[in-house]
Amino acid sequence: MIRVEVCDDMDYVKEVIMDDEMWDRCADDYTVKDPSIVDMMGCIWLKCFVDEKPSGVVSLHHSSTSVADIHIYIPKDNRGKNTKDIGHCVLNWVKDNAVSTLHKLNTKIPVIYKDVIRFAHSIGFENEGYDRRSIMKNGELIDRVCFGLSISEIKT
């Protein structure tokens, strides 16, 4: 069984985010790897479970009253057959629990992470363009794909 709940276990959030492989994928070259950054992100954290085992976290950060940025962090050991189901569970949690003014979710994914781009498409996000040369990865400025999903488009 897959479920999602609000996370107040910041130690687990930091464990996921500070993992070397995860950090390399989600941070740009200029961001100092410091666990206190998680406390400063100003977002709502969700914790994902598969068969009651913690299996990832999600950050939701309002960029306006109508839009939230979402990032799903699934540790490498938990990726695979349940990844898409985790994504759908997260989206359904947002649809069921978000404030009434939230109408859309956005995310930006570096173009080098084809697996994450496929994941975003697989759970319903639509490509809305590019944020050109917007993140420094491995010493090179690269593009990010901009994805969006209206709350009304979330499939239950």
Residue ranges and their predicted role:
Residues 47, 53-61, 68-69:
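Conserved beta-strand in the GNAT
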Residues 80-96, 118:
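Conserved acetyl-CoA-binding loop-helix of GNAT-fold acetyltransferases
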Residues 35-49, 56:
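A short helix-loop-beta-strand connector motif used in the catalytic cores of GNAT acetyltransferases and
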Residues 108, 126-142:
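Conserved catalytic-core motifs of GNAT/GCN5-like acyltransferases
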Residues 105-121, 134-135:
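Conserved beta-strand-loop-alpha-helix junction that forms the acyl-donor binding cleft
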Residues 61, 65-77, 108:
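Conserved acetyl-CoA binding element of GNAT-fold acetyltransferases
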Residues 53-56, 115, 141:
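Glycine-rich acetyl-CoA-binding "A-motif" of GNAT/NAT acetyltransferases
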Residues 1-30:
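Short amphipathic alpha-helix that is part of the acyltransferase structural core
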